[in-house]
Amino acid sequence: METLLGVSLVILWLQLARVNSQQGEEDPQALSIQEGENATMNCSYKTSINNLQWYRQNSGRGLVHLILIRSNEREKHSGRLRVTLDTSKKSSSLLITASRAADTASYFCATD
């Protein structure tokens, strides 16, 4: 009898939420990685902000808040998540360490 061994694949989708009519850029639009690898997603914004928040959304479900970083913070951690904020470049990154199949979702950033 043959045993079939497969590699689990985690697909993370990043989309940028446009808040207050800001035009943003997303990078990457789709990310495909192996389970256990780290995933980094980026978002950029055009105007000054007070806070930046990251959300995730599973297919057919509502948004789930992940983490908030204030404009005076550079880095913040929560479990396997790490978010960085560079206000001089108007950009933020979300790092998910040791990705799992359950991390498959659309990811959004929003500013206020």
Swiss-Prot record:
Subcellular location: Cell membrane
Signal peptide (from-to): 1-21
Cystine pairs: 43-109
Chain ranges of the Ig-like domain: 22-112
Example GO BP: response to bacterium
SUPFAM superfamilies found in the cross-reference section: Immunoglobulin
Keywords: Adaptive immunity, Cell membrane, Disulfide bond, Glycoprotein, Immunity, Immunoglobulin domain, Membrane, Receptor, Signal, T cell receptor
GO CC, any one term: T cell receptor complex
Glycosylation, residue list: 38, 42
The keyword Nucleotide-binding appears for this protein: no
InterPro entries, per the entry: Ig-like_dom, Ig-like_dom_sf, Ig-like_fold, Ig_V-set, TCR_alpha_variable
Keyword Cell membrane (UniProt): yes
Assembly, per entry: Alpha-beta TR is a heterodimer composed of an alpha and beta chain; disulfide-linked. The alpha-beta TR is associated with the transmembrane signaling CD3 coreceptor proteins to form the TR-CD3 (TcR or TCR). The assembly of alpha-beta TR heterodimers with CD3 occurs in the endoplasmic reticulum where a single alpha-beta TR heterodimer associates with one CD3D-CD3E heterodimer, one CD3G-CD3E heterodimer and one CD247 homodimer forming a stable octameric structure. CD3D-CD3E and CD3G-CD3E heterodimers preferentially associate with TR alpha and TR beta chains, respectively.
Function field: V region of the variable domain of T cell receptor (TR) alpha chain that participates in the antigen recognition. Alpha-beta T cell receptors are antigen specific receptors which are essential to the immune response and are present on the cell surface of T lymphocytes. Recognize peptide-major histocompatibility (MH) (pMH) complexes that are displayed by antigen presenting cells (APC), a prerequisite for efficient T cell adaptive immunity against pathogens.
Record protein name field: T cell receptor alpha variable 17
Species of the source: Homo sapiens (Human)
Lineage: Eukaryota, Metazoa, Chordata, Craniata, Vertebrata
Gene from which the chain derives: TRAV17
